[in-house]
Amino acid sequence: MLVLAKEPRPGRVKTRLCPPYTAGQAARIAAAALADTLHTVSATPAGARILVIDGTYPAPPGWTTLPQRGGSLGERLANAFADAQPKNTATVLIGMDTPQVTAGHLAGALESLTVPGGPDAVLGPAVDGGWWALGLRDPGYAAVLPGIATSTSTTGRLTLDALRRRGLQVELLEPLRDVDTAADARTVAAACPPHSRFAAAVAADVPGPGEFAR
């Protein structure tokens, strides 16, 4: 299991939350999302758990930490797969923007990749047109990623098309909403469990009435 993340420093993360949030509030929300994500991955049965970080962040006990490499997001994604696991090891990568993800989501993705006759890849579509999870039976398949435009409303479709052009059988996972805007933050917080750090952070830093529509 890989988690691709960015150090939650004010001004570097979740800038689309500002306004209505301040940079400090956005960083606290990002830190909570990352903490929830790492907690969930820690609860998911996996041969290894690796935090691939831009910046610095303390990984949970038993995790490995690797730096991100590459310029574009596509390059960093491909390098994360290449750096983290040996060839022919089923690997699932997620980011830090879906703190509502469950261990069940992740375990199901890994199981699909390890059963005989299962798919070559699993892709979790995001509601905004991107994707929240990518799992590969062989991490070498990630070589298709640098050529895909990221952070657009067509990234998910382009990724699916690229995997299929590679000749891969792809299983689609449950769509999830990721956190880009203040409205996303409120919606995702409502989908998180009561003990969620993310939900608590959103509740603690609620903007004024009507601001979530921005």
Where are the model-predicted features located?
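N-terminal nucleotide-binding beta1-loop-alpha1 segment
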Residues: 1-16
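A short, N-terminal amphipathic alpha-helix
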Residues: 28-46
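Short, polar loop motifs at secondary-structure junctions
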Residues: 52-58
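Short phosphate-binding loop-to-helix
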Residues: 61-92, 152-155
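Active-site acidic Asp-centered loop
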Residues: 94-96
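Conserved donor-nucleotide/metal-binding helix-loop-beta segment in metal-dependent transferases, i.e.
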Residues: 101-129
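Short, glycine-/small-residue-rich phosphate/pyrophosphate-handling segment
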Residues: 139-162
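Conserved alpha/beta core of the MobA/IspD/sugar-nucleotide pyrophosphorylase nucleotidyltransferase superfamily
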Residues: 158-214
